[in-house]
């Protein structure tokens, strides 16, 4: 029996159908990779499956007693609480039961309290609740997290680990993960792959990391303009099946278009069409017109181009014996020169100080010792990991070009609505607030703004987070 069944699901956001009467089911031990363009409704669907949001219409059924855990795209924690306290929230129900058991154990006994103690005992045993502290500590140890450190001092990757730990300690039957690899370093992603493959429950995850999908998924489910389609196997298998499907669909559409054109010529002749025996043919023509009108044409492609600034000097940045420490050394005696035309990748584990090093190179923070010098005629476009530059109350149009309907790209004027359309934001959405966008759409908007500014140095801190597969390939 399926763990979760979604039937005739409908969900709309404004004039856009995110779910258009679609179906979905999840079986035991399945690991489903949910894919689709940014803004198609993947995160909304995941929240609906996890019981956090409601459908407009349709039904959602769960197997009785099903335990679920959900990890958000950008987990929110109290920055002053410790890692141990945050992860313990994953066993809040177990903690409450054990506290009640301990209170009843020392209270005056009667038939009701005795019956309640038996109930709690069986619940705790079924949820492995007697040793929840040990489970939390073991999980933190596996994820290399210090239980006593404050959340606010953690990097983006380590905060994601805390959210994963919080979900895992709940021992769920189904794990829902929204962009689980965001902010994780390469070793952490490999570790997460192994963890999910060994996980005994079912997994539904959203990610645009193709290698991760290949390693983890047993099935790919694509959300495309309100409809869910399932493909067995991993992402590589999906690509092969999808290519065949697109080719078959194109052939069928071409045949239908040819037949429709022939029938339109016939109906315009008029005389034959008035005969009684032609009624069936007229009905077929109407049906062909309906099918053509309802056809879901291929989605547009994003157009990425960078507005080039003035040519920079030969040296972009020069670092000489640079050191920087906070509670520990981050950068120690580092010397490097970055030249015009270089493409530099910064690698390192979560919390190692990659973002700090970026800021040292850019001059937004000063080294404790040594010198960091920017070259001449440098125009920097900076894409930051925490997306601090987003004004959620601004409209898309105002965010891209404040106070003007026009922007200049490589010396040519372009209307801001047309420019937004290059990044797959329809003209109708140009006046929507930024707050209505999904995580991936917000990143696409940031890229649109970034590329609209003349620049000769691009600085990208985790640029691929939340972006869909098509956009990633173009980037």
Region spans (language model):
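A short, polar/charged loop/turn motif at coil->beta-strand junctions and beta-hairpin connectors
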Residues: 261, 296-300, 311-313
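Leucine-rich amphipathic alpha-helices with coiled-coil/heptad-repeat character
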Residues: 101, 108, 124, 131, ...
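ABC ATP-binding cassette signature C-motif
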Residues: 1-254, 304-475
């Amino acid at each position: 029996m399926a763990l979760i069944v979604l039937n005739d699901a409908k969900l709309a956001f404004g004039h856009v159908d995110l779910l258009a009467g679609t179906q979905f089911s999840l079986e035991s031990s399945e690991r489903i990779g949910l894919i689709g363009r940014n803004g198609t409704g993947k995160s909304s669907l995941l929240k609906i499956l996890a019981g956090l949001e409601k459908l407009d219409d349709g039904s959602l059924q769960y197997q009785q007693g099903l335990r679920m855990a959900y990890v958000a795209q950008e987990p929110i924690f109290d920055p002053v609480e410790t890692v141990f306290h945050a992860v313990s929230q994953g066993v809040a129900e177990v903690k409450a039961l054990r506290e009640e058991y301990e209170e009843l154990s020392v209270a005056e006994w009667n038939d009701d309290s005795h019956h309640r103690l038996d109930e709690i005992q069986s619940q705790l045993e079924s949820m492995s609740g007697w040793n929840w502290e040990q489970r939390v500590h073991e999980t933190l140890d596996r994820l290399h997290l210090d239980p006593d450190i404050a959340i606010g001092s953690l990097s983006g990757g380590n905060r994601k680990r805390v959210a994963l730990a919080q979900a895992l300690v709940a021992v769920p039957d189904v794990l829902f993960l929204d962009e689980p690899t965001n902010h994780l370093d390469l070793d952490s992603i490999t570790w997460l792959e192994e963890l999910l493959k060994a996980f005994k429950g079912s997994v539904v995850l959203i990610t645009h990391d193709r290698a991760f999908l290949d390693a983890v998924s047993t099935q790919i489910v694509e959300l495309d303009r309100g409809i869910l389609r399932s493909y067995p196997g991993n992402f590589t298998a999906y690509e092969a099946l999808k290519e065949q499907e697109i080719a078959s669909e194109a052939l069928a559409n071409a045949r239908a278009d040819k037949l429709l054109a022939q029938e339109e010529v016939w109906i315009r002749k008029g005389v034959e069409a008035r005969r009684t025996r032609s009624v069936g043919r007229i009905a077929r023509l109407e049906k062909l017109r309906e099918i053509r009108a309802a056809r879901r044409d291929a989605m547009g492609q994003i157009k990425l181009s960078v507005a080039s600034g003035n040519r920079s000097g030969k040296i972009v940045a020069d670092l000489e014996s640079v050191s920087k420490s906070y509670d520990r050394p981050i950068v120690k005696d580092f010397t490097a020169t970055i030249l015009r035309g270089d493409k530099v990748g910064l690698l390192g584990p979560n919390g190692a100080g990659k973002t700090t090093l970026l800021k040292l190179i850019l001059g937004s923070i000063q080294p404790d010792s040594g010198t960091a010098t920017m070259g001449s005629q440098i125009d920097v476009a900076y894409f930051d990991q925490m997306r601090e530059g987003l004004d959620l109350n601004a409209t898309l149009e105002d965010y891209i070009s404040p106070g003007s309907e026009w922007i200049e790209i490589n010396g040519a004027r372009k209307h801001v609505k047309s420019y937004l359309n290059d990044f797959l934001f329809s003209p109708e959405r140009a006046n929507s607030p930024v707050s209505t966008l999904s995580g991936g759409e917000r990143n696409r908007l940031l890229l649109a703004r970034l590329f609209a500014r003349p620049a000769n140095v691009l600085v990208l801190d985790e640029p691929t987070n939340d972006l869909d597969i098509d956009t990633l390939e173009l980037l």
